[in-house]
């Protein structure tokens, strides 16, 4: 194959602010019942702007093609988490029932615009300018129940169960400008839309014993 020389020069500018926040509050219904609510928020946005000059030369350093490529890209991401916990104690020492719920939303969206200018002897296989938009996120619901109770002296029984319902999605849409027809065309691939759902179940059983200065704990866990 004939040797060629590719030169690419340009500049890029990035910017990415972030925001964080959290809040938690509790309400003591009475001496045996406690309700706790919490929330956490994280949000970020990255922007990227680039300008490049691309030049191809043959083995004799004669120009083959030239063009300028400019791109603007934005990524938005983060998470929102909300939790609710209910704790119920009894008059029996160290006996405790906890019921918990968690919700989490994690978006991750991207979009970019790319154009070619000052094109000389270059024919890309797809039209330009191009728009690419991806919208993705994961939603997760988690419910959990935990129960702890003493049995005999220095012995404790623990049981619990958890259920997670998780939904993930990702949709990508692409358009390119057809210069000959003067229209935007959809060039989205058939496998660019994604959906996935998960149901996760788990349960555990534990038993602990203390003997003077020593302790023993055994347990089993089942996940599905």
Identify what each model region corresponds to.
Residues 1-224:
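Primarily recognizes Gram-negative and organellar outer-membrane beta-barrels
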């Amino acid at each position: 194959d004939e040797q060629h020389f590719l030169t690419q020069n340009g500049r890029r500018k990035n910017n990415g602010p972030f925001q964080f926040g959290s809040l938690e509050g509790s309400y003591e219904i009475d001496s045996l019942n406690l309700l706790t609510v919490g929330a956490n928020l994280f949000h970020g946005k990255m922007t990227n702007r680039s300008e490049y000059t691309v030049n191809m030369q043959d083995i004799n350093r004669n120009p083959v093609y030239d063009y300028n490529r400019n791109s603007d890209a934005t990524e938005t991401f983060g998470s929102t988490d909300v939790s609710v916990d209910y704790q119920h104690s009894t008059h029996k020492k160290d006996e405790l029932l906890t019921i918990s719920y968690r919700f989490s939303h994690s978006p991750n969206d991207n979009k970019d615009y790319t154009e070619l200018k000052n094109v000389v002897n270059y024919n890309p296989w797809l039209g330009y300018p191009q728009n690419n938009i991806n919208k993705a996120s994961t939603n997760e619901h988690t419910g959990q129940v935990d129960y702890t109770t003493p049995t005999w002296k220095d012995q404790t029984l623990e049981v619990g169960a958890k259920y997670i319902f998780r939904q993930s999605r990702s949709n990508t849409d692409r358009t390119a400008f057809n210069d000959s027809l003067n229209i935007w065309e959809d060039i989205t691939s058939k496998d660019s839309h994604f959906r996935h759902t998960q149901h996760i179940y788990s349960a555990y059983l534990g038993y602990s014993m203390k003997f003077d200065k020593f302790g023993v704990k055994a347990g089993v866990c089942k996940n599905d």
